[in-house]
């Protein structure tokens, strides 16, 4: 385990474990407790995280009749009773509805509600995970981990006894080393209680993936990093830590610890061997992270403000440039611009400023944005001017109407990059929308305030 940092809160999660000859003689939370830092949250669907734990690990809900049942370990400290789940779910589907906290603090995880970003399920909630998505074998016994697909997430915004402000804490997780992507963000840890982005340093969570928009490690990833809100960090340098290696183990142990102006990343093979230290030092060299402003909610599978564009959802896009934070991307006929929109605006304007997220017309890894009030018409660029145009089915339009979001270049929200012209982003310039580059021959390519002008806060749509 990681060396202790003053007063500490320990969190543990074990959602997928590799087959091993036997369980270790002490559970992860027993080990933390022996070091004077008992778990305040302990989530695991494959096994008990305390040797003495006999309570429920998780709850599943049956698709055929909506009935639920709890899955417990076979014996104190043991592997989950997958046989009970298989019997209960026979002939139908099951979802994981609750992941219980084994620490005794009641910090259970349930379906994440809508936050800064809305989810794909009803009323904007995130999806629940399939109960059979991540089968594993532990100590010769079948168990099920939690398979997190994009749009799946769990959360507790009222967690008890978790670290807040600049208090110290430790986070530990066992993860599937083959299941990751470059989206933002697969996290487990401490996040905002509101589900909104409340600023740098307001969360501290384990991240695993190969997103390169902010921090990176050596090689091409995936890496263990820390999501501290508005940035993924691998060390002191906000851009790169060459000591944070790309990992290729089938199952990975990941740990992040943080205290006042000190934090650490550790990781290793979950099947055997010790953890290695990838970083141990001062907080990142960026504003807002020293001191930290942690809020104490718990998340799994999502970013602190529920970040992940979801196909089928409806969104509005707000400018983040200081001059223009009440202005949203809207259209007037085929012209795309920014307009001041609020809850008191007309119904017509609210619709003009609302967009449905669709699978990218040219690339399914990215997105296209369909007008709410003009169905089958999409945002696209023509001579780098953004327009609203009806989908004529042509390859040219599909490419011009496909965009790839990434973390906002100014640290806020998202920047939306053209798939067909990867150096160009959604930008407002004189209140008109362009596909602009950071410097170039066009007036709208002016590098002044570029990062602010291409960063957008994504929220639930006005209509």
From Swiss-Prot:
Region (ABD): 309-463
Keywords: Carbohydrate metabolism, Disulfide bond, Glycoprotein, Glycosidase, Hydrolase, Polysaccharide degradation, Secreted, Signal, Xylan degradation
Enzyme Commission code(s) on record: 3.2.1.55
Region: Catalytic, residue numbers: 27-308
Activity versus pH, per record: Optimum pH is 4.7.
Listed InterPro entries: A-L-arabinofuranosidase_B_cat, ABFB, AbfB_ABD, AbfB_ABD_sf, ConA-like_dom_sf
Example of a GO biological process term: xylan catabolic process
List of glycosylated residues: 81, 280, 332
Molecular function terms from GO: alpha-L-arabinofuranosidase activity
Main location per the UniProt record: secreted
Family: Belongs to the glycosyl hydrolase 54 family.
Protein name: Alpha-L-arabinofuranosidase B
Source organism of the structure: Penicillium canescens
